[in-house]
Amino acid sequence: MDLKWDDFFNDYEWLIVFLKGMVKPAAALVVVLLAVILSYSQNLSLEGEMIYSVSRSFLQLSVIGFVLQFIFNQENSGWIILAYLFMVSVAGYTAGQRARHVPRGKYVAGLSILAGTSITMFLLVLLNVFPFTPRYMIPIAGMLVGNAMTVTGVTMKQLRDDIKMQLNLVETALALGATPRQATLQQVKRALVISLSPVLDSCKTVGLISLPGAMTGMIMGGASPLEAIQLQIVVMNMMVGAATVSSITSTYLCWPSFFTKAYQLQTHVFSSD
């Protein structure tokens, strides 16, 4: 049986291109080797974790690259929803892990992230800022979900910790007739300020200290810097909006876990460290 080499190379041309493109990432392992050597010389015992982390990131990015290539070739809007829901699920689980002492924290985080990011993307698609295609929406959703995940996790953890620290103050306010919202108003404000501050600081310094990923990618891809900043401005605005909606939503969804229907604190929630 004769092997048709032309057909073989045509069918697997994408794989050959991929393997050729991996030469530069492989060369970049030199700096990882440097980090491993420094860790060993300083007795940090991080060599194994460094190698595992880099290997895992390589595997994850390679897999997602092939998945995205497949999705982009389909030109089917349904894949946007599936990819988005998968990202929200992983983000909700991760944020819930950070706020592990909040009952049903993973569901609270997931719903909060879903609310913040879906509202933001819906508005911008409605305004025709981005076309509703996989090539645009999936990368944008990834940036928004990742940012909302961090902010939501910090908000939930900080709110629970602040209420625990000021438990007597909150209980006194409840005893005097305050609602859960009134009794925890200061704690909610503090949690939101702490969680949103990094996002706002990033907006203040964008372009001055570092060039964001979306802008850098477009410039390296050959786009005009002026075109790149237009996209980055939109992305930064979306991140602020999604993070704010997600974090505020999480505070509302946390209350049923913190208080009974009779407006009493669920003391067992705050007893664990």
UniProtKB/Swiss-Prot annotation:
One example of a Gene Ontology biological process annotation: response to aluminum ion
Q: Which residues cross the membrane?
A: 14-34, 51-71, 76-96, 107-127, 136-156, 191-213, 228-248
* Induction comment from the UniProt entry of this chain: By Al, primarily in leaf hydathodes and the phloem throughout the plant, along with the root cortex. Regulated positively by STOP1.
State if Acetylation is listed as a keyword. no
Q: Which GO CC annotations does the UniProt entry carry?
A: plasma membrane
| Domain of life, source organism | Eukaryota
Tissue specificity statement from the Swiss-Prot or TrEMBL entry:
Expressed in roots, leaves, stems, and flowers.
Keyword terms of this UniProt record: Cell membrane, Membrane, Transmembrane, Transmembrane helix
Q: Name one Pfam family in it.
A: UPF0014
Q: Just give the chief location class.
A: membrane
Q: What topology does the record note for this protein and the membrane?
A: Multi-pass membrane protein
InterPro entries with a match to the protein in the record: UPF0014_fam
- List where in the cell it is found: Cell membrane
Q: Which family does it belong to?
A: Belongs to the UPF0014 family.
Q: Anything else of interest in the record?
A: ALS3 transcripts are mobile in the phloem sap.
What is the documented function of this protein?
Answer: Required for aluminum (Al) resistance/tolerance, probably by translocating Al from sensitive tissues such as growing roots to tissues less sensisitive to the toxic effects of Al.
Q: What is this protein called?
A: Protein ALUMINUM SENSITIVE 3
What is the originating organism of this protein?
A: Arabidopsis thaliana
Q: Which gene encodes it?
A: ALS3
